[in-house]
Swiss-Prot record:
A GO CC annotation given for this chain: Golgi membrane
Keyword Membrane: yes
Protein family membership: Belongs to the TVP23 family.
Gene behind the chain: TVP23
Regions crossing the membrane: 80-100, 104-120, 166-186, 190-210
Annotated Low complexity bias: 40-59
Protein name: Golgi apparatus membrane protein TVP23
Pfam families for this protein: DUF846
GO biological process terms on file: protein secretion; vesicle-mediated transport
Annotated stretches, region: Disordered: 1-59
Keyword NADP: no
Membrane topology, from the record: Multi-pass membrane protein
Keywords for the protein's UniProt record, in alphabetical order: Golgi apparatus, Membrane, Transmembrane, Transmembrane helix
Entry superkingdom: Eukaryota
Length: 254
């Protein structure tokens, strides 16, 4: 190689490249476009959630409803139990005694004992603990008898479940004994009518006594509220009147 030969003549030129022509979007559109993927939510999770919610709701309903739920929410479950136990036992013994024994005296004594225990328990234990009411008949020195009603302090309200179940037991069972009296008359079972009449006497006595005791308690509470409000208004009015008189006297003689 001679020195005088130029250097660029020895370098091979690059290959000629043609610039792309046409519309680029046309080239892209010529290729097949992939189908769009649509994501749809599955119902598996929602169904599982709904099943879980239904399961939880049923569990809560089972926890809050039924006999077990009532006793669980009661503030005095033992008193509530014996209130219904004596009443249901007296009716069951009266209805089923003829199927197990033909001894009329034994059946009568059993029903009367259950009725007496229910009468004492309802008046002295269940009424006092479940609704805060109590009543008794008292005879003074002159020989006159009168009813005495006792009620709980209004600041300590009764449990709603206890109150509801107590009043249900108080009013429903006399209706059941009344129905049994009608059945005894229709079946000409006159031997058992005295037992039903005694049951009605015990139950109606409790109904009347606790109804009047509840009315007396509400009246006392209303009187105390009204008396307290009027007393408060009177105290404020007295203070305002005293202040106005003092200011008026000071202006006249000042």
């Amino acid at each position: 190689m001679s020195v005088t030969q130029p250097l660029f003549s020895t370098i091979e030129p690059d290959e000629e490249t043609t610039a792309p022509s046409g519309n680029i979007q046309d080239n892209r559109s010529s290729k097949p476009r992939p189908e769009p993927i649509v994501l749809t939510p599955t119902t598996r999770s929602t169904s599982s959630n709904s099943n879980a919610q239904n399961t939880m709701a049923s569990n809560e309903g089972d926890a809050e409803a039924g006999i077990a739920g009532i006793f669980r929410q009661s503030a005095h479950p033992l008193a509530l139990f014996f209130l219904y136990f004596f009443r249901i036992a007296a009716i069951l013994v009266y209805i089923l005694c003829g199927w197990f024994t033909d001894n009329y005296v034994l059946s009568t004594v059993t029903v009367v004992v259950l009725l007496a225990m229910d009468f004492w328990n309802c008046r002295n234990v269940a009424g006092r603990t479940l609704v805060g009411l109590r009543f008794w008949n008292q005879v003074d020195e002159d020989g006159e008898s009168y009813w005495v009603f006792e009620s709980r302090d209004p600041s300590r309200p009764a449990n709603p479940i206890d109150s509801k179940m107590f009043w249900i037991a108080l009013y429903v069972f006399p209706l059941l004994w009344g129905a049994l009296l009608i059945v005894s008359i229709l079946k000409l079972g006159f031997a058992f009518i005295p037992i039903v009449v005694l049951a009605l006497v015990f139950n109606i006595t409790n109904v009347v006594g606790f109804t009047y005791a509840d009315r007396d308690a509400k009246q006392k509470w209303a009187n105390s509220v009204v008396g307290g409000s009027w007393g408060g208004i009177g105290g404020i009015g007295g203070q305002l009147l005293t202040t106005a008189v003092k200011k008026g006297v000071g202006r006249v003689f000042g």
